[in-house]
Amino acid sequence: MNTARKLFDTLNDEYLAVHKAKEDLFWSTYMASSDDHAGFARAEQAYKEFISDPARLASVREALASLARVPESADRQSLEHGLRGWLALFECNIVDSDVARDLMRELIDVESGLFARRKDLALHHINEAGAREEATLSMLSTNLVTNPNEAARRSSHDALMGLERWVLDNGFLDIVRKRNAFARAQGFADYFEYKVRKNEQMSCAELFTVLDDFEARTRAANERAMHELTQAHGAGATEPWNLRFNISGDITRQFDPYLSFAKGLQRWVDSFRRLGISYRGATLQLDLLERKGKYQNGFCHGPIPTFYDRDNKWVAGQINFTAEAQPDQVGSGARAINTLFHEGGHAAHFANVTQNAPCFSQEFAPTSMAYAETQSMFCDSLLDDADWLKRYARNAAGEPVPDSLIRQRIETTQPFAAFAQRGILVVPFFERALYQLSDDALDNETVLALARDCERRILGVPVGPRPLLAIPHLLNQESAASYHGYLLANMAVYQTRAYFEREYGYLTDNPAIGPALARHYWAPGNSLSHNETLISLTGEPFNAKYLADSCNRTVDEAWAEARAKITAAATRDYPPHPANDLDATIRIVHGAEVLADNTESDEAMCMGFERWIGEHYPASQQGTAQH
């Protein structure tokens, strides 16, 4: 047993070293505070070689076999549990073929090169002031939703279409070929099949049984919504630069004073604290503002995964997450609070994994993407709840958002609930078809035609408002061929919400939710499957019906539910929240600059952040009253 124990402790120590080295360089290069792309590629390679090492896999199997001859005890059971975690990680990532190992090294190099070139690419559009400006993906998306000028919106979409061409002209299809070769060298049909097997422990056929069923269940609602939009706004309503504006642009603008960017941090802290969410002593670093060269999509990564070490001492997490907001842009406050809840949900999950090895609490395979995204998307789903909006969304005078505006929002967005989910669904339909193409068929025009065909079939429009090849997830091997995880997660989110509503009658500021999530979803990490965690909390296996039912609700049904939540919240005697803070050390940074921290208190940090935003973005200072 001593030999097995020594191996286990060595794996924990060595993994922490290679994981942290990779994640520290990931953060610095993605945040544009370092240009050491070669160093990151080397660290990524070292990490990949560790998790795909056949010798380590053989050693773990040998150690587990030796433990079978040891008498039962709590110590043996704990050690066996930890080694099985390592077994799952190595079996999930093993690369037995020399050819595949060489291809993996080549993939890391070419993806690093594409990332470095993408960081230097500047996109431009016409902003609300009528000026041409450099724009991040977040700014382009927000402009498409909120800018009342059609020509300005079209400039944002043109930039996204230009990005598609840039991606194709800068080696993406060579990466697709190499990914397929890597997968085939290991016996898989293509890279999409490889990723689904590795990440979700499903076959492609099993995945599309779920996705095809959801597509069929929501098709009529989507077709009806597109028809009604055209009837209401004319033939140009579904043009890609008009679609999101016609769906929610005016309502987003009307909500803007109630969801100011500067108050987003305070609202995140207060809401999570009242839910009973604790970060168990983690160190959090948040980089929230757009910056030239910074990666243009929110993410959450943990350089130090949580676990109990060999002395049963708690190793608290070190977690970074990011947004890329332009605080004085209309709609930026809503996007920022969504990112804080989403990435903050990821951070809460990974800060609360309480197993005995870091392999259980890292975000890559065998951790299911659907499982990980369930945690973040559950948290950001609260932002659409009418009782959350009434308690937290307030303007500069301290007035809550009026019921009439909440109703107007529902009238505007509920008919397009199916379209919103199909906006996720279209990505796996495209990626599966992309990786099924032969190497010879992978040319720019064929792939662009494939993208447009998928958008036409799934979204019901000739071109999507977010063109498929402009989605950053497709470029990175960790997130490529994984986007279906968001839809599977949202199905689990609505199943989870239904459970809490049955059990407690409400979600917003319910202090029972954080502890329940921590116990059933977070603590096990990847030692349980996604389905097992759902059964543990809700008592039923994975069930897609809750999301489909939500998409198919009428406006009247959605408003009746919202009104009931508002009425109940107004008279509810909320129980006390379990703690006065999030039990985390938090730093808000802008590159190398520290904007605020909670050395004194969470309240002081939020006030310091709000003050910094007011000084640097005075136009954003609306709706900043305390609630």
Question: What would you call each of these model-derived segments?
Answer:
Residues M1-A4, A88, L340, A348-H349, ...:
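C-terminal, non-catalytic "cap/extension" segments appended to globular domains
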Residues E128, R132-M139, T146, L173-E324, ...:
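Active-site-proximal, well-structured secondary-structure segments within enzyme catalytic domains
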Residues V167-G171:
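Amphipathic, heptad-repeat-like alpha-helical segments
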Residues L259-S260, N320-F341:
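Short pre-active-site segment immediately N-terminal to the catalytic Zn-binding motif
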Residues M1-W166, A441, Q477-A481, L582-H627:
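N-terminal helix-rich structural modules
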Residues E193, S332-L340, A347-F378:
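Post-HEXXH active-site segment of zinc metalloproteases
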Residues D311-Q318, N338-T339, E343-Q355, L389-R394:
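Alpha-helical recognition segments enriched in aromatics with Gly/Pro capping
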Residues L211-A220, A365-D403:
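Post-HExxH zinc-binding segment in Zn-dependent metallohydrolases
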